[in-house]
Amino acid sequence: MRVKLADVCERGSSNLKQADIPGKSGDYPVYGASGYIGNVDFYQQKKPYVAVVKDGAGIGRAMLLPAESSVIGTMQYLLPKSVVLPEYLFYVVKHMHLEKYFSGATIPHIYFKDYQNEEFTLDDLNKQHEVVTTLRKVESVIENRQQQLQKLDDLIKARFVEMFGDPGTNPMGWKETTIGEECFYIK
């Protein structure tokens, strides 16, 4: 069934400032637009939730965050109602491209009132579990492939150095010259 975002979650806000976090300690994590910031001795959300960057760089980016944690004021809580799994809500919001709702030239902002009417298909809870499981597997495959590509890139660089040596130190003793001295132009 098609529903609006506002039908399946409640909006929440935080008054925490990033400057207040360093030097504090505790068991409960605090997150910002770039991820984990530090721990404090309290939390603002008891259950898992979705946080959306609402101010500054990265606006519209969604994060799935754990129970007993908090976010700073540049983030906004999307607290799932009982009809939606937090993970399902995360994937839905992640693919809504909320950045299209930004306003403000110097510091961009997005407001829940602007994107609360975004529609999506809400499946029953069993189907949501299936969708989340499938998407986790797909993300895992993508992550593994990215790691493989990075390792292949490292291998190519290592092979180049093995064949030609390090261009900075020239351990092979290659003659140093210019392209103009070694090549000629054919028209």
What is the predicted role of each segment?
Residues 86, 101-107, 123-131:
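Short, flexible active-site-proximal loops enriched in glycine and acidic residues
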